[in-house]
Amino acid sequence: MAGGITDTGELYSPYVGLVYMFNLIVGTGALTMPKAFATAGWLVSLVLLMFLGFMSYMTTTFVVEAMAAANAQLRWKRMEKRKEDDEDEDSSSGVSDSDVLLRDSYERAETRPILSVQRRGSPNIFEITERVEMGQMASMFFNKVGVNLFYFCIIIYLYGDLAIYAAAVPVSLMQVTCAIGNHSCNVGDGTKYNDTDKCWGPIRRIDAYRLYLAAFTLLLGPFTFFNVQKTKYLQIMTSLMRWIAFILMIILALIRISRGQAEGHPSMAQLSGIRNLFGVCVYSFMCQHSLPSLITPISKKRHVNKLVLLDYILILAFYSLLSFTAIYCFRNDTLMDMYTLNFTNCEIINVAFIRYFLGLFPVFTISTNFPIIAVTLRNNWKTLFHREGGTYPWLVDRIVFPAITLVPPVLVVFCTHDLESLVGITGAYAGNGIQYLIPAFLAYCSRKDTQLVFGSGTVNKHLSPFRHTFWIVFVLIWGFSCFVFVTANIVLSESKL
């Protein structure tokens, strides 16, 4: 996510893009949503989920608009540079001044109709053909302070991402293997385990968790010191596993409900659970930082905003189905932070393979993503401190940056493995900035720059449906209000303890 223009890659159809976006948004956050739903109450959860889905869609259209504006400016700068190069060639050649004046007047006559067409909404100048990452857009439209705040926000978000991933794998391994060690398969039967309970012999559950965390760090941590990327086949495999797991959980919960074995009696509203639910929902709708690599390769972008809207409706329906089947199938106090662990109970499913597949599902999928996110965070650190023309010493480049990437999240999850809180805090703070504040500022600043460069009559063909300034102000007020609300909620909760 470091700012820069990268290759667009192979083009694909709008509907393939719709599938890719669905897969991008529906990830780890969905596994923590059922617990957050149960804690906040079904009505509050549904209303908040729908509202936050709408807000996320709005800011997604802001980012698409900013991408189009960035592409237009890059084209305009290249046109200006070519014009300057041509003038330099003319001045260095032996042509007379009168010839140069004649050619200049001819060029101006040729360019005037082009510019007037662009102001009426030419499909060319605002076409999204180059992948301009969010960091590059921030550099184009923000001042130096804004760029630094952007990188600070995205770095904090990626730290939260790494912490969630680093905790999810050891938690899943601890829950499954400690149950085996106790000759039981009742991880999700409602039995409350403490961290000090025995796992195997003298080893406590918290000790097992930290051993798994150490092994996870030693196995995947070294990838932070190298360059890795997710291959096409690995992406297909992890996506396939994810959808098999989600479909299995929904079907198993529906079967249990249809047989009259449902235990859930969710409340309508519990305001104390809103803080975590807010963070989980924001985290679960997060896609804005990856939109450039997702939208740019789409071959036909004429109706891209409608396709994105369709995606959000499908995702909203999926989240609702997953969460409602969960809260009616399981009692509130038995729902686990990682929803997959509720299906490791023999009473839910007596097929051992399915139990272990669901219980260990986060281990496989998250382990493939961890090195990629770590390398992305490392590269953002490098971009933040980079100075034009400068290079980093070998020690700083190969040791210091990877170390400051890996150590902080591992230390955090060494002290806590509360996944719901980790997801909630990451979404409520850094996620809030990336999903609401940055897109709103990008839309506002890109509109100002577009008017400055092309004139007030310019029409961006990818202009957001929420084009009135009111919507930008609304998103900014909402984003800052969320910061205040979540912080006040945390302070008040801590003061009651």
Swiss-Prot record:
Pfam families according to UniProt: Aa_trans
Cytoplasmic face residues: 1-10, 57-148, 227-234, 299-306, 378-398, 443-471
Membrane-spanning ranges: 11-31, 36-56, 149-169, 206-226, 235-255, 278-298, 307-327, 357-377, 399-419, 422-442, 472-492
Topology, Extracellular side: 32-35, 170-205, 256-277, 328-356, 420-421, 493-497
InterPro entries (UniProt xref): AA_transpt_TM
Keyword Methyltransferase in record: no
Subcellular compartments: Membrane
Residues linked to a glycan: N194
Domain of life: Eukaryota
GO cellular component, one term: membrane
Bilayer disposition of the protein: Multi-pass membrane protein
Keyword terms, alphabetized: Glycoprotein, Membrane, Transmembrane, Transmembrane helix
Family from the record: Belongs to the TMEM104 family.
PANTHER family assigned: TRANSMEMBRANE PROTEIN 104, TRANSMEMBRANE PROTEIN 104-RELATED
Name by which UniProt lists this protein: Transmembrane protein 104
